[in-house]
Amino acid sequence: MPNPSLGLLGLCIASVLLAGCSGAKTASPVQTPGAPIKPGTQWLEKGAALLQAKPPIDALNAYLDGFHFYNGQPAIQMEAHHYCAILNEDVIQCVIYDGSTATAKIMGVEYIIDQKLFARLPDKEKALWHSHGYEVSSGQLVAPGIPAPAEHALMKRLATTYGKTWHTWHTDQDQSLPMGVPQLMMGFTADGQADPAMVEQRNRRLGIDTTQTRKQRADIDIPTPDTGADSWQKGVVIQLNDPTGTHLHKPATTTPADTNSRSAR
């Protein structure tokens, strides 16, 4: 049976976010090579913005900020900005950026489904997905800029979902262009996994207190994850081999305070 709270929540989120509340801005960690935009191109862009309808883009009315790591490389972590469209009561699709400015780079996509749909998936498919319960209960997953009651309702809904995430532009590895092949990403499932400095950098920039958020979410029921999800914890690591050698996963350094955070340990 569809969950009516998500439909109501979608209206709440849309009304708030369309008003422009999105919190502090986060810059991309890389500069894209290429010639500056010419006046003619600017006019073309402005004309397209005025004349062309963009229903799929207009549907991206929810903003989530959280963290991912490369499947098989749990120490290589980064902040991820999700701009999401609620397709129905049980399915959400998100475009993932490495920041929240107009020049942020598209890092990848995440598909989010409710536990009812996840339970129907074949076991081999489940291994590609990660649970969201800990991300919610820990306070690491946030919805910047919306009122606390709306965020709490959203997190209550997301606690029962699973995500499948692919990153295609690895700016956390200082790639100024989308090189290499897509990589499967995962989410944290327990304390001690996320780089605390990475989380703190994000928290300071967005004005978030994760400890306080965690307390406020103590009343959210977190289901036991399906045993087919988070397969990396069981030693089942699925990843695409990269013939270009791009994904050597070099240790990263910290980024400036106003820039997308990443692990550096």
For each predicted feature, which ranges?
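An exposed acidic His-Trp-rich patch
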Residues: 100-186, 191
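N-terminal secretory signal peptides
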Residues: 33-98
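Alpha-helical membrane-anchoring segments
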Residues: 54-61, 66-78, 104-105, 112-117, ...
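A cross-kingdom marker for long, charged
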Residues: 213-265
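C-terminal motif of bacterial Sec signal peptides marking the signal peptidase cleavage site
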Residues: 17-20
